[in-house]
Amino acid sequence: MPSIKRALISLSDKTGAVEFAQTLHKLGVEILSTGGTAKLLADAGVPVIEVADYTGFPEMLDGRVKTLHPKIHGGILGRRDLPEHVAKMEEHGIGNIDLVCVNLYPFAATIAKPNCTLEDAIENIDIGGPTMVRSAAKNWKHVAIVTDPADFPAIAAEMEANNGALSDKTRFNLSRKAFSHTAQYDGMISNYLTSLSDDVLSGTPEIGEFPSQFNQSWIKVQDMRYGENPHQRAAFYRDVYPAAGSLSAYKQLQGKELSYNNIADADAAWEAVKSFDAPACVIVKHANPCGVAVAADTLTAYKLAYATDTTSAFGGIIAFNREVDGETVKQITDNQFMEVLMAPKFTAEALEIAAAKKNVRVLQISLTTPLEAGANRFELKRVGGGLLVQTPDIYRLNRADLKVVSKRQLTEQEWNDLMFVWNVAKYVKSNAIVFGKGGQTYGIGAGQMSRVDSTRIAARKAQDANLDLNGACAASDAFFPFRDGVDVIAEQGIKAIIHPAGSMRDQEVFDAADEHGIAMVVTGVRHFRH
């Protein structure tokens, strides 16, 4: 492993640059640099050589040409193991560059700014940076490329332990990371440019939601033992820039490694529970809520959610949107087996009690952002040979948007109950019917091909749980195609229904509500979930 003798450092994100450069200097490495990076290092007392001085060619064209020079790229691309390369480099006075530390212009931050113009975006497309990164990554056997400041400490430590050298394994891993970095960067540029409206040459073109070519990058978090079933292989990836408060930001505090199904179910539970403002508990099984409740505290919320369907809750995923205390965890572990327990925070006592169930996965995820800020920009669904892309369903109803279509008006408690069951229905697989009262689900009918069957299942679930539906409320994620669903709901003693409307037989459905003395509210918004 030959020692690194010369490094080129040119950074947009300069985190840790000074400390890393100081280590290189102590190891006798000559440092080349440009612009702001050179000034930063020089001001910190690190000897640097400006690239313009090294090449004998000035920086020009407003900084567009700085490192695009044979003395730079020859020094990076030249193979030390080929005599003809070595001879040519000596002939033209090109020295080896053994380490390249480069990250790229902040294109993502630029286009995220309000009123970003096309010119602003174009000027933040890096040219020299990716060229150096790709050159160094291609020649990884002889050159190390560092694109992530988070790698500086490990690289410095390895060099200090090996007389300034890096192993083949390290250089190859850095090369792979570098090519991923430039691929993600170019994909982001492509997405932006192909999203622009037809008036692209105007000063501030409108950015469409869906580019004509869709490029996306993810980072592997873990390989899994298997996928949805044992004969399927699987891995979990996260976004390069994951939304704050999203599942991929989890910190696992205890328990076995998460499985494919654990993650799918945990995501369903987390998305549902964080949609509530009041303290809430959501219990999920096979990506469907089987019990949901809001209450004054986590213990009460859990007891109410669990009471909805104690059978289905077994082996479920349990999520809270508030700090969980020891009393709550004690109640859960006394009641049931669970796969995953999730919350923004746990007390020390809660973690101590959970530790007695060593196989339970305990996940902590910060909830400091509004629901909208914690949502993915896109939801993706693979189909044969293609990809469906849509914006997330984060629509939140305001009471002012709702329309009462029945003769009977609603009590204040019924309004509150309708808003609760409607929010739950949004997270239940279609066709979805949810019964509830007092911030507690009483019955959930999910995933049936006919809406009336989901209605009957919700009624049976409430009956099995000995929950009295008299005076309860019902939500349907889509319109009732016939009055039969309303008739079944009326048989249970339910007094208010919320649904989108939009059926050819809406009037028939409205009339059925009036016949039964049921208050009916329509939303005009559907929440299909497949």
Curated annotation (Swiss-Prot):
Keywords of the record: Hydrolase, Multifunctional enzyme, Purine biosynthesis, Transferase
Coiled coil: none
GO terms for cellular component: cytosol
Entry EC no(s): 2.1.2.3, 3.5.4.10
Sequence ranges assigned to domain MGS-like in this UniProt record: 1-147
Source species, domain of life: Bacteria
Catalyses which reaction(s): (6R)-10-formyltetrahydrofolate + 5-amino-1-(5-phospho-beta-D-ribosyl)imidazole-4-carboxamide = 5-formamido-1-(5-phospho-D-ribosyl)imidazole-4-carboxamide + (6S)-5,6,7,8-tetrahydrofolate; IMP + H2O = 5-formamido-1-(5-phospho-D-ribosyl)imidazole-4-carboxamide
InterPro entries in the cross-refs: AICAR_Tfase_dup_dom_sf, Cytidine_deaminase-like, MGS-like_dom, MGS-like_dom_sf, PurH-like
CDD domains from the UniProt entry: IMPCH
PROSITE patterns, A to Z: MGS (PS51855)
Pathway(s) this gene product operates in, as recorded in its UniProt entry: Purine metabolism; IMP biosynthesis via de novo pathway; 5-formamido-1-(5-phospho-D-ribosyl)imidazole-4-carboxamide from 5-amino-1-(5-phospho-D-ribosyl)imidazole-4-carboxamide (10-formyl THF route): step 1/1; Purine metabolism; IMP biosynthesis via de novo pathway; IMP from 5-formamido-1-(5-phospho-D-ribosyl)imidazole-4-carboxamide: step 1/1
One GO MF term: IMP cyclohydrolase activity
Single biological process term from Gene Ontology: 'de novo' IMP biosynthetic process
Family: Belongs to the PurH family.
Comment on protein domains: The IMP cyclohydrolase activity resides in the N-terminal region.
Protein name per UniProt: Bifunctional purine biosynthesis protein PurH
Gene: purH
